[in-house]
A protein has these predicted regions:
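Active-site rim beta-loop-alpha module in soluble metabolic enzymes
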Residues: 162-224
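Short beta-strand-to-turn element immediately C-terminal to the catalytic PLP-Schiff-base lysine
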Residues: 33, 132, 138-143, 254-258, ...
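DPxDG-like acidic metal-binding loop motif
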Residues: 26, 88-112, 133-138, 143
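ATP-binding N-lobe of GHMP and related small-molecule kinases
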Residues: 1-86, 100, 104, 108-110, ...
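Glycine-rich, charge-dense phosphate/pyrophosphate-binding loop(s)
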Residues: 201-298
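FAD-binding core of FAD-dependent oxidoreductases
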Residues: 8-12, 16-23, 88-95, 123-138
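Glycine-rich beta-alpha junction loops
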Residues: 26, 36, 136, 164-169, ...
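Alpha/beta catalytic cores of group-transfer enzymes, especially the acyltransferase/condensing modules
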Residues: 110-157, 244
Length: 298
């Protein structure tokens, strides 16, 4: 039996649509062992598929097939801390758990690059799967087969406050609202800000983040699908956030604050409640630089 720890992820980071993502200190756990049948259970009562449609099982089976092996069955126990359909990489966590677990069971025939590529092929884009696997902040380009990526570990005195509503937003719906084409001007707008985000985060020029998270490719459209989104942004900025953006496809809003900004999450939550937005919860995290880990093996 092996036990796997997989971090939540926050993708896009404002202007870095489908290219930038980072891992957070917020984890799912999966226990996995080979079996002669499919046995899947939830350790914490969160409803998960218990048949061969389970995404962890599907991903593990894909890896076995890539390696020329047949997966007869799998025994899985899932602890799902990461909320589903909230823009925090819950599906990517399942994919990466399945791949890393299966690769470990087979004696690690695939390299890290192989796993990054296979995860992106399953998910369709690497902005959540790559940081879930690698940790840190990851810049990635997916050409349909191969992911070209750079991971950078981040040791900054920042906290990331995930402001999570009590409703879901499916990625399919969040993508369907996006335009088929954008102007050259808007493309340049995003390119410059995506580059500014990474450079500012890594060099400590945090005052740039408010500009760097601005975006014209996805956030203006997705805000219309997230009730009270603009008000949540305003509240976070009023309490001193460096930058605020929609995490992944949403509906979670991520606020970046300085470590010295004491009780930031609590102050944001207090203001949300006073504004009649008590359905939004606030959780503070740091950047996870380790990525997915095998934390027990016997």
């Amino acid at each position: 039996m092996i036990k796997i720890r997989i971090p939540a992820t926050s993708a896009n980071l404002g202007a870095g649509f489908d290219a930038l993502g980072l891992a957070l200190t917020y984890y799912n756990y999966v226990e996995m062992e080979e079996s002669d049948k499919v046995e899947i259970r939830s350790a914490d009562g969160v409803e998960v598929p218990t048949d061969e449609n389970n995404l962890i099982y599907v991903s593990a089976k894909d890896l076995f097939e890539v390696c020329g092996k047949k997966l007869e069955g799998l025994k899985l126990t899932q602890t799902n801390t990461i909320p589903m359909a909230r823009g925090l990489g819950s599906s990517s966590a399942c994919i990466v758990a399945g791949l890393v677990g299966a690769n470990t069971l087979l004696g690690e025939p695939l390299t890290t690059d192989d796993l990054v590529d296979l995860a992106a092929q399953i998910e369709g884009h690497p902005d959540n799967t790559a940081p879930a696997l690698l940790g840190g902040i990851v810049t990635a380009v997916f050409d349909g087969r191969k992911v070209h990526w750079v991971k950078q570990e981040v040791f900054t005195k920042l906290k990331f406050a995930a402001i999570i509503p009590d409703f879901e937003l499916k990625t399919e719906k969040a993508r369907a609202c996006l335009p088929k084409e954008v102007s050259h001007k808007d493309a340049v707008y995003n390119l410059s800000r995506a580059a500014l985000f990474s450079a500012s985060l890594l060099t400590g020029k945090f005052e740039n983040l408010r500009t760097a998270v601005h975006d014209k490719l996805h956030q203006p459209y997705r805000m219309e699908l997230i009730p009270n989104c603009r008000e949540v942004f305003d509240i976070a900025y009023n309490h001193g956030a460096y930058g605020v953006y929609i995490s992944g496809a949403g509906p979670t809003v991520m606020a970046i604050a300085d470590e010295s900004n004491e009780f930031f999450g609590g102050k944001v939550k207090f203001s949300l409640d006073n504004a009649g937005l008590s359905g939004w919860q606030v959780h503070e995290f740091r950047i996870d630089n380790e990525g997915t880990k095998i934390i027990d093996k016997n």
